[in-house]
Amino acid sequence: MNCKIKTVSPLTTYAVRHPVLRQGKPIASCAFPGDEDPTSLHLAAVFNEDVIGVVSVFTNATGVFSDLKQMQLRGMAVLPEAQGSGIGKMLVHAAEIYAKERGTTLLWFNARINAVHFYERLGYQIMGEAFEIEGIGTH
């Protein structure tokens, strides 16, 4: 699929966050702490002017590896009809470049259990035990 990755506003991410990550919940549930922080980045995969995938990067530390400069990948989502086409990989790669350009040595995220294999294929490793986010699912 031939699409462009571009920087967008937090509000633009809701077009994918809502149906993929917050389905059946109020649209306000798509707002994440840090969305409006000037150091946060929101990326969208755009195909024929439609947003089909999104990811956000936040300056946030895990509390583990405190000696490393950390950023958090969050809100990674691709519309079902575009999944499996390489869009997610493109978004993660663009987020990695952004983090690296800012001297980040650890890019981390809380992956949903059904997305773990996707991240492992990109070279990421599981750290820690699975946990439940109420109303969202197992991570």
Predicted regions and their residues:
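A short beta-loop-alpha structural element at the N-terminal edge
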Residues: 2-14
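Conserved active-site tyrosine of GNAT-family acetyltransferases
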Residues: 17, 119, 124
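Conserved catalytic-core motifs of GNAT/GCN5-like acyltransferases
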Residues: 108-110, 125-139
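Conserved beta-strand in the GNAT
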Residues: 44, 50-61, 72-77
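A conserved beta-turn-beta hairpin within the catalytic core of GNAT-like acetyltransferases
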Residues: 60-73, 83, 135-138
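Conserved acetyl-CoA-binding loop-helix of GNAT-fold acetyltransferases
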Residues: 78, 84-97
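Conserved GNAT acetyl-CoA-binding A-motif
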Residues: 92, 99-112
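Active-site rim helix/loop that mediates acceptor-substrate recognition in acyltransferases
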Residues: 17-48, 62
